[in-house]
Swiss-Prot record:
It comes from Geobacter sp. (strain M21). GO terms for biological process: translation. Coiled coil: none annotated. Belongs to the bacterial ribosomal protein bL12 family. This is Large ribosomal subunit protein bL12. Keywords: Ribonucleoprotein, Ribosomal protein. It comes from the Bacteria. Homodimer. Part of the ribosomal stalk of the 50S ribosomal subunit. Forms a multimeric L10(L12)X complex, where L10 forms an elongated spine to which 2 to 4 L12 dimers bind in a sequential fashion. Binds GTP-bound translation factors. HAMAP family: Ribosomal_bL12. Forms part of the ribosomal stalk which helps the ribosome interact with GTP-bound translation factors. Is thus essential for accurate translation. One of its GO terms (cellular component) is cytosolic large ribosomal subunit. GO terms for molecular function: mRNA binding; structural constituent of ribosome. Gene3D superfamilies: 3.30.1390.10, Single helix bin. InterPro entries: Ribosomal_bL12, Ribosomal_bL12_C, Ribosomal_bL12_C/ClpS-like, Ribosomal_bL12_oligo, Ribosomal_bL12_oligo_N_sf.
Length: 126
């Protein structure tokens, strides 16, 4: 009972943008690749990538672990940080743990974490 390519494509077509973004991120982590890298850089990237990451991390991800008791305030902060619509922000908060922002600077990640924690959320910066 193998899954066909058509079934996979049909499943992906029915995913929301947030679900699809999470799928891409999980695939990038599982296979150690980046969907945003140009082909020329991707060929040289795996050899240089881990060494650079060990030196100093420059890109951070803000992960919403839970909304806490004040979910409405957390949704408002998520909307302000991400420019998502109300439904998308609510889906993101309801689906925690979820990445709120990815690939951002250390300062921006700290600011986002501060805002979310002040709203009552449990947040992790990776």
């Amino acid at each position: 009972m193998a899954i066909t390519k058509e079934e996979v494509i049909s499943f992906i077509e029915n995913m929301s943008v947030l679900e699809l973004a999470n799928l891409v991120k999980e695939l990038e982590e599982k296979f150690g690749v980046s969907a945003a890298a140009p082909v020329a850089v991707a060929a040289a990237g795996p050899a240089a990538g881990p060494a650079e990451a060990a030196e100093e991390k420059t890109e951070f991800d803000v992960i919403l672990k839970s909304a806490g008791a004040n979910k409405i305030a957390v949704i408002k902060v998520v909307r302000a940080l991400t420019s998502l619509g109300l439904k998308e922000a609510k889906d993101l908060v309801d689906g925690a743990p979820q990445p709120v922002k990815t690939g951002i600077s250390k300062e921006e990640a700290a600011d986002a974490q501060k805002q979310l924690v002040e709203a009552g959320a449990e947040v992790e910066v990776k």
